[in-house]
């Protein structure tokens, strides 16, 4: 069984955990519809950067 040689100080423990933080996803608001969507993704209504780029199932 693995056993630590020396106790890790609170400072070193914090440095070790410094990359474990969760990131908030980049959220954007569509300018034409006002809907919230992920950045660089099409909104649920088929708009991207103010232009209609995809027909939704309701329209087809």
UniProtKB/Swiss-Prot annotation:
SUPFAM superfamilies: Zn-binding ribosomal proteins. GO terms for cellular component: large ribosomal subunit. It comes from the Bacteria. Residues 1-25 are annotated as: Disordered. GO terms for biological process: translation. InterPro entries: Ribosomal_bL32, Ribosomal_bL32_bact, Ribosomal_zn-bd. One of its GO terms (molecular function) is structural constituent of ribosome. Pfam families: Ribosomal_L32p (PF01783). Keywords: Ribonucleoprotein, Ribosomal protein. Residues 9-19 have a biased composition (Basic residues). PANTHER family: 50S RIBOSOMAL PROTEIN L32, LARGE RIBOSOMAL SUBUNIT PROTEIN BL32. Belongs to the bacterial ribosomal protein bL32 family. This is Large ribosomal subunit protein bL32.
